[in-house]
């Protein structure tokens, strides 16, 4: 039996205080063709992080890949098809390899980078109309989306692809994440009247995990941690008005809180090096980014560095990089199109 305790944060009654101890710094990023679009940011450790997305070219979108080496960002164009239209998406670390999902010409594939820096590709067994999400761990990878027949859950075991059935009533998988080859989780839209449902893969089948999500809610993302702790974040809607919720599994029960984030989109939520949850939020200052820190019932904010003549500063994704937090996104300077930005909290100035 799964228990659920609901707790409303006292921060909801007052505007959270600014995190005065936080100091974000700007990091130079080599320019992309304008305007760029950011997909993902993931870090293996303090000396390796990858940011993906696409940039605009005359013939459409081109894949965009940047690497952080602990000191600086650099552009990586060594992967096959770097000059071919397409887009790079989610980054996963599988053993010593880096796996990146890519779409081009309507087809999907996994790009694999070895520890020595060589690239190879694993094509999907079929093209999909939509590629919703991707997850990979040692011994397994999943791509979820849709084709003309409906929902597709494609599973790769390291040598071949198979199509996995979803439970009855599941219409669409909106996201997927995995801790191991026999411990994967997904959130789905269903026709059962339950709305969003969390599913679990145990190595044999997908089934309803019976997670007691708030009524009339969706899921933005799930964080799986090696300790077994899980965090789900999403929005709950009452009379058309949304508010952000957090659910945490501590090994015994689900605990639900409602930090005073309004209806912030929290898909970029990460566990920071300080143990708190962090996410970029919409800033009330056009010339600075803004980040929220949730530590239990305590909610604080911090701002990025001031950017001269900026009219829109949008960090899109976050990653924990050793003892630092790293963000990647876009900044629009008055009179020009958006270009890339990166900011760091902690580390060398």
Question: Over which residues does each language-model region extend?
Answer:
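Residue-level hotspots at or immediately adjacent to binding/recognition sites across diverse folds
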Residues: 15-349
């Amino acid at each position: 039996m799964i228990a659920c305790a609901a707790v409303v944060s006292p921060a909801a009654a007052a505007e959270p205080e600014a995190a005065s101890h936080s100091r974000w710094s700007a990091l130079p990023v080599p320019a992309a063709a304008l305007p760029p679009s950011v997909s993902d940011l993931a870090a293996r450790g303090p000396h390796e992080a990858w940011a993906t997305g696409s940039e605009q070219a005359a013939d459409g979108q081109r894949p965009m890949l940047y690497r952080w080496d602990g000191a600086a960002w650099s552009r990586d164009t060594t992967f096959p098809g770097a000059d071919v239209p397409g887009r790079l998406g989610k980054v996963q670390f599988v053993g010593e390899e880096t796996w990146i999902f890519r779409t081009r010409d309507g087809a999907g594939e996994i790009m694999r980078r070895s520890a020595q820096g060589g690239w190879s590709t694993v094509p999907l067994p079929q093209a999909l109309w939509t590629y919703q999400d991707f997850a990979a761990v040692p011994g397994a990878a999943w791509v979820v989306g849709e084709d003309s027949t409906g929902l597709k859950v494609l599973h790769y075991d390291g040598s071949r692809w198979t199509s996995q059935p979803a439970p009855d009533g599941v219409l669409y998988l909106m996201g997927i994440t995995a801790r191991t080859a026999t411990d994967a989780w997904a959130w789905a839209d269903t026709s059962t009247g339950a709305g969003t449902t969390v599913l679990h893969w145990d190595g044999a089948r997908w089934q309803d995990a019976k997670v007691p999500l708030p009524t009339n809610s969706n899921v933005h993302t799930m964080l799986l941690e090696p300790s077994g702790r899980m965090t789900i974040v999403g929005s709950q809607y009452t009379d058309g008005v949304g508010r952000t919720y957090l659910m945490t599994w501590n090994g015994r029960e689900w605990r639900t809180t409602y930090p005073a984030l309004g209806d912030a989109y929290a898909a970029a939520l990460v566990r920071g090096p300080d143990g708190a949850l962090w996410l970029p939020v919409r800033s009330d200052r056009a010339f600075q980014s803004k980040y929220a820190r949730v530590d239990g019932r305590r909610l604080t904010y911090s701002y990025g560095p001031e950017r001269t003549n900026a009219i829109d500063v949008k960090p899109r994704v976050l990653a924990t990089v050793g003892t630092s937090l790293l963000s990647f996104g876009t900044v629009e300077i008055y009179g020009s199109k958006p270009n890339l930005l990166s900011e760091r909290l902690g580390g060398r100035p």
